[in-house]
Amino acid sequence: MSTRSAGRPRTSSRALIEDAAAELFLENTYGATTIDQIAQRAGVSRNTFFNYFAAKSDLLWGELDAAIDRLEVELRAVDPDVAALPALRATILAAVADIGVDRVPLALTQEDVMGTREETRSSGLTRYARRADVIAAFLARQQGTAVDDLTVLAKANAVSGAISAAWTVWARAGVGRHPLSEYVARALDAV
């Protein structure tokens, strides 16, 4: 008797959906591609699509959402007695360390062809804000202040902005790009 569960393995289905979407965005543009077309190309149901992605725009970000999730989990695990900023820097760098040079979201490198420029700006802002919220919660906890404290919010948004700048420069660096963590480290040095 086989112990294999029915259906595709979860990681394969997610990757298949991402690949199918990228192909369709390149062929038809982002705006002209429907979720039903993506599911059909990937060979999955519409329900399966929504098991992995809450919205079509989630397909644009590849590793970024997972990196924010890792950052949130790791920041919660930091000892409250540790100095906030060095711990924040180390945790951010650890969260992006496994993102290889081959994992650049196509939506960022192929914005014109895919027609994703407006959507990456819009959905990117959501990710920027989520990351800033995660960082603000950490800083507030470490410093014993309110999460809406001006200094906490200023630091959190400066750091989130630096990370966004690093992602942008990394994505646009082309075939000569270095690991993302190098760009993030340089951007964090600037703030």
Predicted regions and their residues:
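Key DNA-contact positions within bacterial/archaeal DNA-binding proteins
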Residues: 47
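Basic, helix-initiating cap at the start of DNA-binding domains
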Residues: 1-28, 32-44
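HTH DNA-binding helix-turn interface
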Residues: 4, 28-30, 50-62
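Hydrophobic alpha-helical segments that form the core
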Residues: 106, 137, 148-170, 182-191
